[in-house]
Amino acid sequence: MNVIFIEVYLLALFFVITKAQLRKEAYMSVPSLIKAAGYPVEKHRVSTEDGYILQMHRIPAGRRSARRSGEPNRKGKRAILIVHGLFGSSGDFVIMGPERSLAYLLADAGYDVWLGNLRGTVYSTHKKLKRNDAQFWDYSFHEHGNDDIPAMMDKVLEITGPPWEPPVFSQPCRSSPSITTK
């Protein structure tokens, strides 16, 4: 009987400790996760023509890179924009940690990584509408592909200039294939 009690106690203790460790990262923002992983991070805001304000997260260098956030000389680094799919956010590309997450792997490979957030995520707002307004949520994939992604692409090009890679991981890319010609 005492053995069962001790096993249950140890199991409960394990779950309490594990839950405490998970809780810390579960409530961190994407920029906080990136910074905690040892990468430089920048937040940028971009406005769409229909008034949405989208937050983008930039990882301008890998952990072992000499270049850090805010340095003007990109030294030929290629910028790459990664955009999440339905019900996602930029967190999708950093949540698995530095050894397995796409954003970190690309940054360590020498890319200037930009993580885009489409309208409807926690990282989007609107100039006039509030989240509880029905009009805030009145959009479709059409607006993702025709408004959000081109605005993000323009922001990347404004900050970094060429060379750059068009979006490579995005469900809305099919909405407007012509955007890859920017």
Positions of predicted regions on the chain:
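Alpha/beta-hydrolase active-site loop
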Residues: 134-160
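Hydrophobic transmembrane alpha-helices of multi-pass solute transporters/permeases
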Residues: 2, 47-51
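Short, hydrophobic/aromatic-rich segments at coil-to-beta transitions
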Residues: 38-44
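Short, surface-exposed "cap/lid" segments of acyl-processing enzymes
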Residues: 28-29, 33, 48, 55-131
